[in-house]
UniProtKB/Swiss-Prot annotation:
<feature type="transmembrane region" description="Helical">
    <location>
        <begin position="257"/>
        <end position="277"/>
    </location>
</feature>
<comment type="function">
    <text>Part of the Sec protein translocase complex. Interacts with the SecYEG preprotein conducting channel. SecDF uses the proton motive force (PMF) to complete protein translocation after the ATP-dependent function of SecA.</text>
</comment>
<keyword id="KW-1133">Transmembrane helix</keyword>
<dbReference type="GO" id="GO:0015450">
    <property type="term" value="F:protein-transporting ATPase activity"/>
</dbReference>
<dbReference type="InterPro" id="IPR005791">
    <property type="entry name" value="SecD"/>
</dbReference>
<dbReference type="InterPro" id="IPR048634">
    <property type="entry name" value="SecD_SecF_C"/>
</dbReference>
<dbReference type="GO" id="GO:0065002">
    <property type="term" value="P:intracellular protein transmembrane transport"/>
</dbReference>
<dbReference type="InterPro" id="IPR022813">
    <property type="entry name" value="SecD/SecF_arch_bac"/>
</dbReference>
<dbReference type="InterPro" id="IPR048631">
    <property type="entry name" value="SecD_1st"/>
</dbReference>
<keyword id="KW-0472">Membrane</keyword>
<dbReference type="InterPro" id="IPR001036">
    <property type="entry name" value="Acrflvin-R"/>
</dbReference>
<feature type="transmembrane region" description="Helical">
    <location>
        <begin position="380"/>
        <end position="400"/>
    </location>
</feature>
<keyword id="KW-0812">Transmembrane</keyword>
<keyword id="KW-0813">Transport</keyword>
<feature type="transmembrane region" description="Helical">
    <location>
        <begin position="278"/>
        <end position="298"/>
    </location>
</feature>
<protein>
    <recommendedName>
        <fullName>Protein translocase subunit SecD</fullName>
    </recommendedName>
</protein>
<dbReference type="GO" id="GO:0005886">
    <property type="term" value="C:plasma membrane"/>
</dbReference>
Amino acid sequence: MKWGRLLAFLAMVVVVLGLTISTGPKIWKSIPLGLDLKGGVDLLYAVDTPKGHPLDSTGKAALVRAIEMRVNSLGVSSPIIQLEGRNQLGQDQIRVEVAGVKNQQEAVSVIGATAQLAIYGSAKIDPKTGKIVPVGPPLATGADLKSNAHWVVDQQTGQNAVAIEFKNASLWTSITKRYLQKPIYVFLNGQLLTNPVVEQVMYTGQSEISGGNLTTPQACIDLANELNAGALPYPLTLESETSVGPTLGATSLHRTLIAGVIAVVLIFAFMIAAYRMAGLIADIALVAYGYLTLLTFAGLHVVLTLSGLAALILGVGIAVDANIITYERIKDEVRNGRSLRSAVRIGNKNAFRTIVDSNATTFIAGLIMYIFGGEGDVRGFAVALMVGIIVSLLTAVLFARAMLLTFTAAQAVKNPWWYGAPRGVVKSREAKV
């Protein structure tokens, strides 16, 4: 027995099991769950683009960024946002799935809201409507503000207000200089919010907005969130909304996990029954596969959906299939009279191309599903499948192979029967170097 090789093998086992047990649960909790596993709201919007100008890649990217900022203000993250073709009116459609949101109506109002803030130097009363309307171009708009608006209480008046800061402090300085001891008019979504008199020149670019309906902290917080999110590049019209309760999502997750655990336990048992010690090594490699897959999901911020979880479990079968191909090649070499170590080396080498070819075809199928799948569930399944294939190649082809070669080199177990060979094919003898 070669103790150095045996200790190296045991070190591999300890590292895999240690990392999985100590950090695996934390990694699992860090992976964002999709709508079908956590509950939430599914919203379908029609995008009001100018006539003759359909939504292009630049417009889509700007719209996605604006929606993401609004979703983040709800206290949740990782929304699934994707184009859904066009409706009967020829309008582009965009679907927004927000998992974990507690207040569905709040999500609808926040995502579709557009806070159009504008500051004018003059205003008048419209004789037809009797409302105060702005005159001339705006002195500044919400686009001139930093994304750090927040609720404050005015220290002098005690009123609720929204603190704002200009990106270019000199702009606010020039406005306050120009309108010193004169009123300015702050409009929100076309309605006059307040018309304070400028009492001093502001040099810091900071100011406060109060008045109108900004009488409560929540109203100020809502306006601050809308200002921070910025204006939507295109108006959105809500066409449909579907909610998934958190209980239903939790039930789906629980049942899928139970099915996955049963499948993994049966696979582990089969590998040990069929390949004995080699099967146990394959099981340890499968643990490494699961750990690395979850780590990849967390690192890439992949939203785990029910279909993605199914693909993750399917990936276990793909990973173990690579081990089975390798072990059957090793058994063939043992039947041909090769020594155990020689059979392991040659068997791994002969199985490599078969494993790569089979995984490549599955990966191509997953890639096609991702490109042409369209629906979020199909794309989620495809992403999880492709990640699983890549990780399985690393664990089954490289890691499991390294473990098996190290263990056979240790000569702790020399009988080929412990590596899946039928009893009596080769008599127990010392492995040749």
